[in-house]
Swiss-Prot record:
The lineage of its organism: Eukaryota, Viridiplantae, Streptophyta, Embryophyta, Tracheophyta. P700 is a chlorophyll a/chlorophyll a' dimer, A0 is one or more chlorophyll a, A1 is one or both phylloquinones and FX is a shared 4Fe-4S iron-sulfur center. The PsaA/B heterodimer binds the P700 chlorophyll special pair and subsequent electron acceptors. PSI consists of a core antenna complex that captures photons, and an electron transfer chain that converts photonic excitation into a charge separation. The eukaryotic PSI reaction center is composed of at least 11 subunits. The keyword 4Fe-4S applies. Phylloquinone binds at W692. It comes from Angiopteris evecta. Pfam families: PsaA_PsaB. The keyword DNA repair does not apply. It is a multi-pass membrane protein. SUPFAM superfamilies: Photosystem I subunits PsaA/PsaB. [4Fe-4S] cluster binds at C573, C582. Keywords: 4Fe-4S, Chlorophyll, Chloroplast, Chromophore, Electron transport, Iron, Iron-sulfur, Magnesium, Membrane, Metal-binding, Oxidoreductase, Photosynthesis, Photosystem I, Plastid, Thylakoid, Transmembrane, Transmembrane helix, Transport. Its EC number is 1.97.1.12. This is Photosystem I P700 chlorophyll a apoprotein A1.
Amino acid sequence: MTIRSPEPEVKIVVERDPIKTSFEKWAQPGHFSRTLAKGPNTTTWIWNLHADAHDFDSHTNDLEDISRKVFSAHFGQLAIILIWLSGMYFHGARFSNYEAWLSDPTHIKPSAQVVWPIVGQEILNGDVGGGFQGIQITSGFFQLWRASGITNELQLYCTAIGALIFAGLMLFAGWFHYHKAAPKLARFQDVESMLNHHLAGLLGLGSLGWAGHQVHVSLPINQLLDAGVDPKEIPLPHEFILNRDLLAQLYPSFAKGLTPFFTSNWSEYADFLTFRGGLNPVTGGLWLTDTAHHHLAIGVLFLVAGHMYRTNWGIGHSIKEILEAHKGPFTGEGHKGLYEILTTSWHAQLALNLAMLGSLTIIVAHHMYSMPPYPYLATDYGTQLSLFTHHMWIGGFLVVGAAAHAAIFMVRDYDPTTQYNNLLDRVLRHRDAIISHLNWVCIFLGFHSFGLYIHNDTMSALGRPQDMFSDTAIQLQPIFAQWIQNTHAFAPSLTAPNATASTSLTWGGGDLIAVGGKVALLPIPLGTADFLVHHIHAFTIHVTVLILLKGVLFARSSRLIPDKANLGFRFPCDGPGRGGTCQVSAWDHVFLGLFWMYNSISIVIFHFSWKMQSDVWGSISDQGVVSHITGGNFAQSATTINGWLRDFLWAQASQVIQSYGSSLSAYGLLFLGAHFVWAFSLMFLFSGRGYWQELIESIVWAHNKLKVAPAIQPRALSIVQGRAVGVAHYLLGGIATTWAFFLARIISVG
């Protein structure tokens, strides 16, 4: 009989000193590729260098090494975020009027940048109130700082320094986990352990820690600020933490300590953990006692979730078992095989995460205005508009990224031999039905939604307003949306008897809340104009999905090009001699999808901007009369294309066009410059590569004549490179134009 040594109890999950630290590679551009490492012969080299520098798949086939590189890069990413955040806090500490704003947030505007007087640029320092001259900011940091209980600039300095120290730790961790103690592949594939730690640690303890900070620091400080106490008189955070009597003066249940908790008498704590709903009438933000309660509850939920998965003790869920048990009567093998995909293809994993995070970011955009989480956020219209726009764009990019990485997974990581009759295989087998149906939906939505507008424009031009679709003629009321609004407005009386208001004032039923004579929020009426533009949203979103999904489902093969998987993720055409096979690569679908994403988000932020100015934002007189910024013109004007052009784009562009010579002049220059960037993109998108190559050769001839020819031969951009440069400038130009248009407008009138 053979005697084996006992199995080691502890698995070895890291490798020590796998790769020595060396700066030599920094001096070799393209060290990761044999071809690129030789250096440039033509100008194509620099483009290929940019395209492949972060494409770890192309550097090596070793999944363990790729995983380590990605893991290490995550720490670098966190370091960059912390450095950026530190800069924001430092600006708040060094260059801002935060303390002045804190003492009078309704009259003083936030500013954290003062322009130096160089060649007249100090014109950008507008008067933001309280005798401070600077650029008005719309990031929402001031409101966030107030909500977290920051009362002076020293605290901002300390936080900024702390963030820099943490950034240094992250950079160290990135180096350490690649060069000193690199995790083995098994570590990255241990999904149950990862779920437990991320759920319980990051989300559970993170939320619990934030709830603790809110209860012990934010709530008392904000309670005193709301009562009008001077920020300089308010005790410092550590005093509240160390001296329970201070807290007990504001929240009497603190005097009882933990007794109510251990005697299950939790309702005693209802003075600082509330469930009120609606907004605080002093600040126009959510009740901070509601948000503290929320974070406590979320923390508990995630702590439970972090104990659900099976690791060393043989109890709990196994993700593989859950997936393989997931079969229905009509779904074949169900989710069998997906576990192997998600533990060996980081592109597949990333695609799912981007799709969910993108959707979540868009949900955040909609909640930031309908349930404004920070004090005085709702009445800072510039910040409201900026936060909505920012989160919509970010969400759009993340969703397109999801499709991009799903397609890369299909091309590089999908193994058809291991995926038989599971849901992924079944979707791929009936992809023609999916795409042709989706195409039909797009055509239907496009013709009908656009047709309603065309009808209205025609009737308007013919002087027949009674034949238009509008709230005053032929009504197309969004009855389902109105029903949802109504249900939510009156639900709390049945579902949450102690709540004083519904989750959001936008649902209806409640009164409006005004802060300092400005509307914070009120019930948002929906009518025919919203019904029309909603169907344009449906149309643009479905077309975006059509393009992206077709790119994923046909990434490996199609009737036109059965061997597409061999050509890779990006290729210009299927070789010479096969006409009509250009723009079919998975990369090209992402490229085209980006334009439709841009269409979709543009119409959403235009809808939001005009709707809020027309029906929500405005001032309120002593008699209680509300004057909206554009006087409620959305319902009538937004029913025609001409109305959108005349009463939204043209009417509201006057501020940015006339901004020269004022503190908003930077937006005028940006508006002009970003239009040029956008137009520049068309030069790449509508160009033929041969045209430029001919031009280049003529210019090279002239250089040769003068004996100043370069050693590196100039080359026209490849087709794919040209498209990449084109779409980048198209999006940059379009987004910066919109940014300048929105901010010049809302800072002037808001």
